[in-house]
């Protein structure tokens, strides 16, 4: 079975489930705190994805946000709803993310945003696509031309935005790391900075950006993989400038 075709069809199927419940969720549970939440729809969506992978790829392992942390040379990485807060509040910027990793390298990734009817995907060596159309990162070579994005991180975000708003056209926070990263690949944003994040949030976006001609590193500027903790996704042309600003912020707040 073709893994990419399997992944796209599966996430679109799960997307139909999410749209039934989008903005209509009554039972919201806290995980690590009031900003880190989960719903029964997260769990149901994850079960759907896991069941299909177990059925068609029974010898392969799974890492999924809601409590599955297997390891292995052939690994599927799942985020059933990336942007649960947006999903619960009826905001459209949420996504389902699925990546396949072989021997530590991401081989394919799919990010599906059902409320936006957008599917972004890539497979190693085959390019990146948005609803079937080939995509490339932007060609903006000056920060003054750029729209960047980041997540909501205590200590880091405010200081990062303060610095970048003076240098860029604008900074946006979408609330879905997977979608944020994929949008770098689509050229919708020029860079995305994420801080202390998990593999299921960014694994699919990582290969989408790379296959779209972009660059993905950690905060030191070294090439990142799905299991790095801090990421800078960019079109490559303004990457060094973003690394510089990020490290100014990290130094100021005294953390890595």
From Swiss-Prot:
What species was this sequence derived from?
Thermotoga maritima (strain ATCC 43589 / DSM 3109 / JCM 10099 / NBRC 100826 / MSB8)
> CDD domains from the xrefs?
IMPase_like
Highest taxon of source: Bacteria
Q: Which UniProt keywords apply?
A: Carbohydrate metabolism, Hydrolase, Magnesium, Metal-binding
Protein name from the UniProt record: Fructose-1,6-bisphosphatase/inositol-1-monophosphatase
Comment on activity versus temperature: Thermostable. No loss of IMPase activity after incubation at 85 degrees Celsius for 30 minutes. Heating at 100 degrees Celsius for 10 minutes results in a loss of about 20 to 25% of the activity, and 30 minutes at this temperature inactivate about 70% of the activity.
Q: Where does Mg(2+) 2 bind?
A: 79, 82, 201
- Regulation of protein activity: In contrast to mammalian I-1-P phosphatases, is only weakly inhibited by Li(+), since 50% inhibitory concentration for Li(+) is about 100 mM, and the Li(+) concentration required to totally abolish I-1-Pase activity is 1 M.
Entry cofactors: Mg(2+)
The signal peptide stretch is none
Q: So where does Mg(2+) 1 get bound? A: 65, 79, 81
Q: Enumerate the InterPro entries for this protein.
A: Inositol_monoP_metal-BS, Inositol_monophosphatase-like, Inositol_monophosphatase_CS
Q: Does the keyword Ligase apply?
A: no
Q: Which family does it belong to?
A: Belongs to the inositol monophosphatase superfamily. FBPase class 4 family.
Tell me which EC number(s) this protein carries.
3.1.3.11, 3.1.3.25
Its function, per the record, reads: Phosphatase with broad specificity; it can dephosphorylate fructose 1,6-bisphosphate, both D and L isomers of inositol-1-phosphate (I-1-P) but displaying a 20-fold higher rate of hydrolysis of D-I-1-P than of the L isomer, 2'-AMP, pNPP, inositol-2-phosphate, beta-glycerol phosphate, and alpha-D-glucose-1-phosphate. Cannot hydrolyze glucose-6-phosphate, fructose-6-phosphate, 5'-AMP and NAD(+). May be involved in the biosynthesis of a unique osmolyte, di-myo-inositol 1,1-phosphate.
Q: Partners and quaternary state?
A: Homotetramer.
GO biological process, any:
phosphatidylinositol phosphate biosynthetic process
Entries under Gene3D superfamilies matching the protein: 3.40.190.80, Fructose-1,6-Bisphosphatase, subunit A, domain 1 (3.30.540.10)
State whether keyword Magnesium applies: yes
Which Pfam families does the entry mention? Inositol_P
First-tier enzyme category under EC = hydrolase
């Amino acid at each position: 079975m073709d893994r990419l075709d399997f992944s796209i069809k599966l996430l679109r199927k799960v997307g139909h489930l999410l749209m039934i419940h989008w903005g209509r969720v009554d039972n919201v549970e806290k995980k690590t705190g009031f900003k880190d939440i989960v719903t029964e729809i997260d769990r149901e969506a994850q079960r759907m994805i896991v069941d299909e992978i177990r059925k068609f790829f029974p010898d392969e392992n799974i890492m999924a946000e809601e409590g599955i942390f297997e390891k292995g040379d052939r690994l599927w990485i799942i985020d059933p709803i990336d942007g649960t807060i947006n999903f619960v509040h009826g905001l459209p910027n949420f996504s389902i993310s699925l990546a396949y990793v072989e021997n530590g390298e991401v081989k394919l990734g799919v990010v599906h945003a059902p409320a936006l009817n957008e599917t972004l995907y890539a497979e190693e060596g085959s390019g990146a696509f948005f609803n079937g159309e080939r995509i490339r990162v932007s060609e903006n070579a000056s920060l003054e031309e750029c729209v960047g994005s980041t997540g909501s991180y205590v200590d880091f975000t405010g200081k990062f935005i303060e610095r970048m708003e003076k240098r860029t056209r604008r900074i946006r926070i979408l609330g879905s790391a997977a979608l944020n990263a994929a949008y770098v690949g689509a050229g919708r944003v020029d860079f995305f900075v994420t801080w202390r994040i998990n593999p299921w949030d960014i694994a699919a976006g990582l290969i989408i950006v790379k296959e779209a001609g972009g660059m993905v590193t950690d905060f030191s500027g070294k090439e990142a993989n799905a299991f790095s903790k801090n990421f800078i996704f960019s079109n490559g042309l303004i990457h060094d400038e973003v690394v510089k600003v990020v490290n100014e912020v990290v130094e100021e707040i005294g953390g890595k």
